[in-house]
Regions:
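Glycine-rich, flexible beta-strand/loop modules in the N-terminal catalytic cores of phosphate-handling
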Residues: 329
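Non-catalytic terminal accessory segments
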Residues: 16-53, 74-77, 87, 91-100, ...
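Classical eukaryotic N-terminal signal peptides for Sec-dependent ER targeting/secretion
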Residues: 1-9
């Protein structure tokens, strides 16, 4: 599914096209007032000789999270607010006479309307990335979401990389282009490495490494990490000793291949500090591969701004462990303005650049008509914060209400009983109470799968197929793990992110944190680094497990009644395979599959909202 990511917000179907009539609003986006006051940071940041502000996996969330239900207000700061924060922090670094670097670890595309809501003929993220380029990033690294569509990769190569002056890094990613003689050449999307000096004159060798990604588009190439570290250019790049290595890459700091890069450097430089800024799995995480290194991963969707600091030693032996600190900041104006951080009041906080970025992003939202309103959601619909099925479950809403209604209006077979099966991963983000806009639809349900069906399937066989696809029998579990690994290689991090949420919730139950009624909902991080990483103390989000596949309400017919078995194109192969396990009367093949509707899953919620939420 991720390989078929949203490339264009398609022309809205006639069934729900906007006629600018009553009930539809096209207004300027606004941040909602939080349902409770925001909690300020708990303690000062620890500064060192080297300090890093880190972002990763922003996925277009440049106007912040604008809903009133927690935890959304924790992350309500927009990119303009962040730019002002960075500016003030740079001033503090100068006063302290230390270095402060700004680093990003990739995935700028695919997440909100600012990146994905562009008009036909444009390129995903082209406009939104311009605003990121206005910040003083010292290093940016490529992510897998820059590689699903060749046009996006080319845009990064032609438009973002030049603005970074050699510091947009793609150590193991190439793009295929035609040279002046019209011959194809493979060259790095950005730069393979960068060497530069900090404001204080410290020498830095930087790399930008992506995980072993296999879902990239044609005419792009991702080299395996284990092969990259054997390349002559890599060995030459790390030959000379800098004051520290800066490894900024789109790869999680746990359970992946950073140790391959780390060990290759350690084989040459046994004690040189190595600072790793990872990403991709959307979690807050930290570990130390040795006493002179730290690895930090800073969440997703501008829900986290990471902080890392260390003080270097001048001893020739460099045998002692270094002292590191890390912090996970909630990106909102209370955090940014806090006396522990910038100590700026609301009056003096906003910089000219920050205000310009905010105004530009708001204008982009207007240009893309992102606040076109389909209806008003009566309450929150979340993916994992409530049980499935339930009235507050987005999965229940999508499978049991929205999809059946949308298909009934967009199929020529509505008079035939059907059962609909979709993958729960089709829903990417929660829906919160209040206006449901074009931006909310792009955020919650971005994938462009269409609906297929197999006719004349017994009702019981269809229901058994869903059950079998979700079962955890040993053989099924093995197949599930194999599919999960394949999905991970193609860029799907949902399983790891959900595991992280589950662990967080389980720890809170064991520690009795649920009774802390004075705390607001948010992330509660346990990582492998010393001390407490979270800048603000929260009570963790409740977590309920969800199945991989969900179904509509079964039709009110007998079990042997022949029905239309409807499903999204993403699950075709697995569904046909499972059909042949749960029954033996017929050998199903892909030849039995036909198009049920050209309606895309990304359109379903808008159709339903116009019907039910007005």
């Amino acid at each position: 599914m991720l390989a078929r990511l949203l490339a264009v917000f398609a022309t809205i179907s006639a069934a729900w096209a906007c006629a600018d009539g009553d009930g539809h609003v096209h207004e300027h986006p606004r941040r909602a007032n939080p349902s409770s006051p925001l909690t300020p940071p708990t303690r000062p940041l620890e500064w060192g000789d080297i300090n890093i502000i880190h972002t990763t996996d922003s996925h277009g969330w440049l106007l912040g999270h604008q809903k009133a239900s927690f935890p959304e207000p924790n992350y309500s700061g927009d990119l303009g607010d962040f730019a002002s924060f960075v500016s003030h922090m740079k001033e503090i670094a100068i006063r302290k006479d230390v270095d402060l670097l700004l680093v990003d670890s990739g995935d700028l595309h695919d997440g909100t309307g600012l990146s994905d809501g562009y008009p036909p003929g444009s390129v995903d993220g082209h406009e939104s990335t311009k605003f990121l380029a206005e910040l003083p990033y010292d290093v940016m690294a490529i992510g897998n979401h820059e590689l699903y569509v060749y046009a996006n990769t080319l845009d990064m190569h032609q438009n973002l990389a030049p603005k970074l002056n050699g510091r947009y890094l793609s150590s193991n990613v190439n793009i295929t282009l035609a040279d002046q003689n019209n011959k194809t050449v493979d060259i790095p999307v950005g730069s393979q490495f960068a060497k530069f000096k900090t404001r204080k004159g410290r020498k830095v060798t930087a790399l930008g490494v992506i995980f072993d990604f296999t879902g990239n588009d044609h005419n792009t190439t991702v080299q395996k990490v284990e092969d990259m570290v054997k390349e002559s250019w890599f060995l030459e790049a790390i030959k000379d000793e800098p004051d520290f290595f800066l490894l900024a890459g789109h790869m999680p700091v746990s359970r992946d291949n950073w140790p391959l890069v780390f060990n290759a450097i350690r084989a040459v430089h046994a004690a040189t500090p190595i600072l790793i800024l990872g990403g991709h799995t959307h979690i807050r995480d930290c570990l130390q591969l040795d006493g002179r290194s730290m690895s930090l991963e800073s969440g997703r969707y501008m829900e986290t701004v990471g902080w890392m600091s260390t003080s270097l030693d001048d001893a020739p032996s460099k045998s002692k462990n270094l002292t590191f600190s890390r912090r996970y900041l909630d990106p909102n104006r209370v955090t940014y303005e806090a006396r522990y951080h910038t100590r700026e009041s609301q009056v003096s906080f906003d910089t000219k650049k920050g205000k310009s970025i905010t105004a530009g992003l708001n204008q982009l939202a207007v240009d893309f008509d992102l606040n076109f309103t389909y209806g008003t959601a009566p309450h929150d619909f979340t993916i994992t914060q409530v049980p499935y099925p339930s009235n507050g479950s987005l999965l229940s809403l999508f499978a049991e209400l929205a999809t059946p209604y949308a298909l009934s209006a967009n199929s020529g077979r509505a008079d035939i009983p059907n059962y609909i099966l979709v993958n729960s991963g089709s829903q990417r983000f929660d829906i919160y109470a209040g206006t449901f806009t074009k931006n909310d639809q792009l955020t919650a349900s971005p994938f462009t799968d269409i609906f297929f069906y197999i006719p004349e399937v017994p009702r019981k066989v269809a229901l058994d197929t869903l059950q079998m696809m979700n079962e955890n029998g040993s053989e099924n579990r093995k197949r599930s793990l194999e599919r999960e690994e394949e999905l991970y290689r193609r860029g799907d991090v949902r399983a790891r992110y959900i595991d992280w949420l589950s662990d967080m919730d389980q720890r809170s139950i064991e520690l009795g944190r649920r009774v802390a009624n004075n705390l607001t909902l948010g992330y509660v991080t346990k990582d492998s680094c010393p001390g407490v990483g979270d800048d603000v103390i929260h009570t963790p989000l409740p977590f309920y497990s969800v199945p991989d596949f969900i179904g509509s309400n079964p039709p009110d017919v007998s079990n042997d009644t022949l029905i239309d078995f409807v499903f999204v194109d993403f699950v075709v192969d697995q569904l046909v395979e499972t059909l042949n396990i749960v029954q033996s009367d017929k050998e199903y093949t892909s030849g039995d599959v036909a198009t049920y509707s050209t309606l895309e899953t990304s359109e379903v919620l808008g159709i339903y909202a116009q019907f039910a939420w007005n």
